[in-house]
Amino acid sequence: MPDFKIVVSDPKTKEDKKEKLKVKVSDKVKSNQGEKEGKAIPLARINDKIKQALNLDDFLTLEITKQEGDKKVKIKGHFKIEVDNTVPDGEVWISKSMAEKFGAEEFEALAYRTRAFQLSLDQSKLPNLVGTKIGDVIDINVSGVNLKLKITGGSDNSGFSMRFDVGGGAKRKILVSGPPGYYPKEDGLRRKRTVRGNMITPEIVQINTIMIR
C-alpha cells in the first residue's frame, strides 16, 4: 500500500517577509523519526521577536542554495516552530538530523513563513482518511503535531486528478471544460478526460489540503 503524499498549503500566507538567520544545532530540539524523509514534521526554536518580524504563525521555512557541480541547488526545510526566548536574536535552533539534510551543523539560511509543505504518510496509519471527500475537514496528528486540514483535491497512482463535481471514488471518462484534468488552450473548448471522483480511496496517492484555523 503506497504512502499518502499530503500537500498542506497555508492560505493565509500572502506576502513573504524574509530574513537571513544563523541556523545552529541544539540538543534542546528533539529529532522526530522520519523528519528528513518528510514522514514527520521537524521542530525549530526561535525567539518571539523573530516570530513577529517574519509574521509567523505555526510554520517556518529555511532555505539555502548550494553549489553542486556546475549548478546551484536549493535545499528547503519546513519546520513547526517553538517559541523559546533563550534563543539569541538572529538565530534559529534545529535538530541534528535536520542539519544533516542541509549538510552542516551551523550555517546561514533564508527564513520565511511556510507557504506549503508535503508529508509522506503510511496509509495504514490514517484509516479514517479513506472515504472522506473533497471539501471535508480532517484532523491528523503527525509526530505530536495536530493539523486541521480541508481536502481540496488530489490524484491517483496513474496521475488522474480528483474532481469535486464527480461523485464516488472510481475513475470515469467525462466531458470537461477546465481544470482539474484539462487545461484548454482556448475558452469554450471541451474534451473527454479520465478523472477520479471526489472520494479518497487507497488508489489515491496525493491529497491536496489547506490548513484550517
Swiss-Prot record:
Pfam families noted in UniProt: Ribosomal_S6e (PF01092)
Coiled coil: none
SMART domains to which the protein is assigned, alphabetical: Ribosomal_S6e (SM01405)
Listed GO biological process terms: translation
GO cellular component assignments: ribonucleoprotein complex; ribosome
NCBIfam families reported in the protein's UniProt record: PRK04290.1-1
Keywords: Ribonucleoprotein, Ribosomal protein
Any one GO molecular function term: structural constituent of ribosome
Species of provenance: Sulfolobus acidocaldarius (strain ATCC 33909 / DSM 639 / JCM 8929 / NBRC 15157 / NCIMB 11770)
Protein name: Small ribosomal subunit protein eS6
Family label: Belongs to the eukaryotic ribosomal protein eS6 family.
